[in-house]
Amino acid sequence: MTNQNDNFLVLKNINKTFGKSVVIDDLDLVIKRGTMVTLLGPSGCGKTTILRLVAGLENPTSGQIFIDGEDVTKSSIQNRDICIVFQSYALFPHMSIGDNVGYGLRMQNIAKEERKQRIREALELVDLAGFEDRFVDQISGGQQQRVALARALVLKPKVLLFDEPLSNLDANLRRSMREKIRELQQSLSITSLYVTHDQTEAFAVSDEVIVMNKGKIVQKAPAKELYQQPNSLFLANFMGESSIFNGQLQGNQVTLNGYQFTLPNAQQFNLPNGDCLVGIRPEAVTLKETGEPSQQCSIKTAVYMGNHWEIVADWAGQDLLINANPEVFNPEQKQAYVHLSSHGVFLLKKE
């Protein structure tokens, strides 16, 4: 039985309007104690507004916000025991790294010796031990982001908020930083809310991902479930690439374009027999030299991407996206036969 106290960060019936524009529309959200949840969605979906409401940087038009059972809806950011890691780092260039990390402790009038110890511990957590006396212009962008993270961790907040913290880093630094963030969040069990527009980042750091659109939650689930079982056409198109076909379902048999195949997990999509939409991820398709006439397709384009060929094929008059093994696919071939793996195929209600 789930303990009600595990519901650590709770938003109830939250609405937020700016003038006549509805930004958040009657939203409910629960984040369990010690978990990391990411808000993901297109620009303007409301994810950053939610983070600002939780932080106390904006007030909801209506609704309530609870942290660890306490109603903080009208509390200032100083009284919410929250820290934010920003995209811009927001470090003071005239201060040493140690003074940057310890700035919040100083504002809380923490004794000097305790400050020094906590600064040292926080820098060790982010692999910057011994950096206390350096200055911002003496360290790299990735190190600056770790200083910003240490500055938040040193305060031991109840809730840690991340506002697109890795957007200014290159691809390799983003990868290492998201690994570090996830490692620290899990080891310290800090309840965390993360905002990003990057699907890979969201999947890498989160216990659960919330996809938003037009101020509402579309689906909240672990990353694997979102990808393999999207609950709407919007989500299917937003979470990675897919090709959507009209099909028919009968038990665990799926038919599309005259091609019938077995989908062992068909029941998990909770659809009745009959017409449906069939979503096919690019990795679910294998091209072979033989098959039934209903499986034949024409290769329209093939682009070499290093670890795979990115192919667009014409299958019964509709585009089919395919990721093909570079050791198997011949870029000179113009015709092939579609074979589907059940992994990477999902079903949706026909709208």
From Swiss-Prot:
Q: Which SUPFAM superfamilies match?
A: MOP-like, P-loop containing nucleoside triphosphate hydrolases
List locations, semicolon-separated.
Answer: Cell inner membrane
A GO CC term? ATP-binding cassette (ABC) transporter complex
Q: Provide any one GO MF term from the record.
A: ATP hydrolysis activity
Bilayer disposition of the protein = Peripheral membrane protein
The residues the record assigns to binding ATP are G41, P42, S43, G44, C45, G46, K47, T48
Q: Provide the alphabetized UniProt keywords.
A: ATP-binding, Cell inner membrane, Cell membrane, Ion transport, Iron, Iron transport, Membrane, Nucleotide-binding, Translocase, Transport
What are its E.C. numbers? 7.2.2.7
Annotated ranges, domain ABC transporter: 9-239
Xref: PROSITE patterns: ABC_TRANSPORTER_1, ABC_TRANSPORTER_2, FBPC
Instruction: Give me the reactions it catalyses.
Output: Fe(3+)(out) + ATP + H2O = Fe(3+)(in) + ADP + phosphate + H(+)
InterPro entries recorded: AAA+_ATPase, ABC_SmlMolc_Importer, ABC_transporter-like_ATP-bd, ABC_transporter-like_CS, ABC_transpr_FbpC, Mo/tungstate-bd_C_term_dom, P-loop_NTPase, Transp-assoc_OB_typ2
Per UniProt, what is one Pfam family of this protein? TOBE_2
Q: How does it assemble?
A: The complex is composed of two ATP-binding proteins (FbpC), two transmembrane proteins (FbpB) and a solute-binding protein (FbpA).
Q: Of which family is this protein a member?
A: Belongs to the ABC transporter superfamily. Fe(3+) ion importer (TC 3.A.1.10) family.
Question: What is the protein's known function?
Answer: Part of the ABC transporter complex FbpABC involved in Fe(3+) ions import. Responsible for energy coupling to the transport system.
Which NCBIfam families does this UniProt record tie to the protein? PRK11432.1
Name used for this protein in its record:
Fe(3+) ions import ATP-binding protein FbpC
At the highest ranks, the source species' classification is: Bacteria, Pseudomonadati, Pseudomonadota, Gammaproteobacteria, Pasteurellales
Q: Which gene is the coding source of this polypeptide chain?
A: fbpC
